[in-house]
Amino acid sequence: MVKITIMGASGTIGKTVAFNLAEKDVIDEIIMFSRPASHERVKGEILDMYDALAAEDIDCELKASSDYADLAGSSIVLITSGVPRKEGMSRLDLAVPNSKIVQEYSKQIAIHAPDSVILIVTNPVDVMTSIALKTSGFDKKRVIGLGNHLDSLRLKTLLSKHFHINSREIHTRVIGEHGDHMVPLLSSTTIGGILLKSFVEYMDLDVPKLVETLKNSGNNIISKKGATEYGPSYAISNLILTIANDTRKILTVSTYLEGEVEGVYDVSLGVPVILCKHGIKRIVPLKMNDEERTEFFDAARTVKKTTYELEKMLNKE
């Protein structure tokens, strides 16, 4: 039996992920966890979802809960709760208020679902991944951040439009911070197995503009509709289904590093990993050119500094 708990299920991301997963008809039970004040609203969301699922003859158990005891038996616990990002805010602006939420939930997960995989979506996700890891006491392979998986999908879309190629043919990756210090690995990006730079259209590619557009993708959506929704939700569902089905895909997620990539340690960053039913099977080696390596080190310094400062602040309270 596969049981998923979504903490923050009353929010846009949480409820959309719940419906995405239910539609796939591979999850047996989904606990939609929220604060008591949102409990009735979540019940309403579930009733609405059941009507939609009935049209497809899908039978998935959905339950609204505000009781931590309902986490018991969860294979994966998703944390989406937090202060939402608004236009003009960096993800790091959210660190202080959101860290307290992640701390509280991580403690409860450790008590009620000690064998689960924790998946962090709350921003700044790289910092929150470290907070969840240290608070829960879990093995680092079982604490994962959404991180650059979403950024990699966004880059894939941008390249698909520029090169007029089906996105399935594009293999690219973004690593580092899920934020201003993300690192697109264009030097190793391929289309149909051929290096990006080999295509004549590459001559017309304004790389600095591409990277800037990529970094501003989330903010651009927020400025127009108030929040990101479908992209993050489907990226999250992709990660959850990969873990739940043990399909061993290589995806880029935020994980705590201890020297595995370029000697970077004591910080959570986005790197490619093989995902399995137990979380991260292993980190996958990757190639970077000198410029990308420098940017990766910059990302490590930035995220590590923020994490240290935040931990110091939390320890004083």
Swiss-Prot record:
Q: Which GO biological process entries does UniProt record here?
A: lactate metabolic process; tricarboxylic acid cycle
The keyword NADP belongs to this UniProt entry's keyword annotation: yes
Q: Which reaction does it catalyse?
A: (S)-malate + NADP(+) = oxaloacetate + NADPH + H(+); (S)-malate + NAD(+) = oxaloacetate + NADH + H(+)
Q: Where is the active site?
A: 178 (proton acceptor)
Q: Which GO terms describe its molecular function?
A: L-lactate dehydrogenase activity; L-malate dehydrogenase (NAD+) activity; L-malate dehydrogenase (NADP+) activity
Keyword terms, alphabetized: NAD, NADP, Oxidoreductase, Tricarboxylic acid cycle
Q: What is its EC number?
A: 1.1.1.299
Signal peptide location in the record? none
Q: Which residues are involved in binding substrate?
A: 85, 91, 123, 154
Tell me the enzyme class.
oxidoreductase
Write out the residues that bind NADP(+): 8-14, 98, 121-123
Question: Per the record, a Pfam family?
Answer: Ldh_1_C
Cell membrane listed as a keyword? no
Instruction: State the InterPro entries in the record.
Output: L-lactate/malate_DH, Lactate/malate_DH_C, Lactate/malate_DH_N, Lactate_DH/Glyco_Ohase_4_C, NAD(P)-bd_dom_sf
Q: What does this protein do?
A: Catalyzes the reversible oxidation of malate to oxaloacetate.
> What does the sequence similarity comment in the record state about its family?
Belongs to the LDH/MDH superfamily.
Q: What is this protein called?
A: Malate dehydrogenase
The gene coding this protein: mdh
